[in-house]
Design a protein with these regions (language model features):
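Intrinsically disordered, low-structural-confidence terminal and linker regions
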Residues: 1-46
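Glycine-rich, flexible loop segments associated with nucleotide phosphate handling
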Residues: 201-207
């Protein structure tokens, strides 16, 4: 049985996150509302274009970056230019598929480094990656270094929103998801070997160091992974279903590998099922 006190509800944590942003800036809501309203209108246009059969890959990247800036940061001066890019991109419904950029990513329509990870890892798993010309993954070359990887993850582990104006959940989750795929998916490991022009190697040391960090990050009481927050009354770790699903899914990946505390993962999932 999982101790209910360990299971912070999504509504409660969202309220506390909002309060932390307001503690930092009393005008937070006044800044957030008009930007979010503009984003909602542009998102409706994007959804309409996609429903009409247009892929809109570049627009989607702009939209996701704007969503992150508005909901996970208070960097308001950065939001307007990204919304402008989104609005302009929506005028072209026949956008070409995104190809690998000069930095090695498939994130041509992203500015933030970590936002390039997801589209790149996805593209590397498409059939074209096995045959088309490829460039070095220079933008993520640092992810081959175990010390850099662990240091970056550790800096993302706890968000102190009142001090920094940044909720690091999205970046931490993106990093964990990308690394779990890069390191644990046989398909990607084989691709890095068969396509040496990518200039990316997953070393045994990287796998060992990352795996050890992953198990240390797991809450042994619940079996879950999730972001942590520094509030005035102490730190709170969220038992996050999305984090946990991706870690379990990519680690196992048809390999038969065993997740530590899997019985706790099941018990916690059953305990929070009404919150999902």
């Amino acid at each position: 049985v999982i101790d209910p006190s360990l299971l912070t509800t999504r509504r409660t944590i969202l309220e506390r996150i909002g309060d932390a942003f307001r503690q930092r800036d009393k005008d937070y809501d006044a800044q957030w509302k008009p930007l979010n309203k503009r984003l909602e209108g542009l998102m409706k246009e994007l959804e309409d274009q996609q429903s009409a059969g247009h892929a809109m890959e570049c627009s989607t990247q702009h939209a996701l970056e704007a969503t992150w800036l508005i909901n996970y940061t208070d960097e308001w001066p950065r939001v307007g230019p990204v919304l402008d890019e989104l609005e302009l991109s929506l005028k072209n419904p026949d956008q070409p598929r995104l190809v690998q950029d000069s930095d090695g990513s498939w994130g041509l329509c992203c500015h933030e480094w970590y936002r390039k990870l997801e589209p790149t890892v996805d593209a590397l798993q498409e059939k074209e990656a096995a045959t088309e010309p490829l460039w070095p993954l220079s933008f993520m070359a640092s992810l081959q270094d175990p010390a850099i990887v662990i240091d970056r993850l550790e800096r993302l582990r706890i968000s102190d929103i009142a001090a920094t104006g940044l909720n690091q959940r999205d970046e931490q989750g993106a990093m964990l998801t990308a690394l779990c795929q890069i390191i644990f998916k046989d398909r990607l490991r084989k691709l890095f070997v068969s396509r040496p022009q990518l200039q990316f190697t997953v070393s045994q040391q990287l796998e060992e160091k990352f795996t050890k960090y992953l198990w240390n990050l797991q809450d042994a009481r619940t079996g879950y992974w999730g972001p942590a927050y520094k509030f005035d009354d102490g730190d709170v770790t969220v038992q996050d279903l999305s984090y946990t699903f991706h870690v379990v899914h990519y680690f196992v990946d048809g390999s038969g590998r065993k997740i530590p505390n899997m019985d706790k993962v099941v018990a916690t999932t059953l305990a929070i099922k009404d919150q999902v």
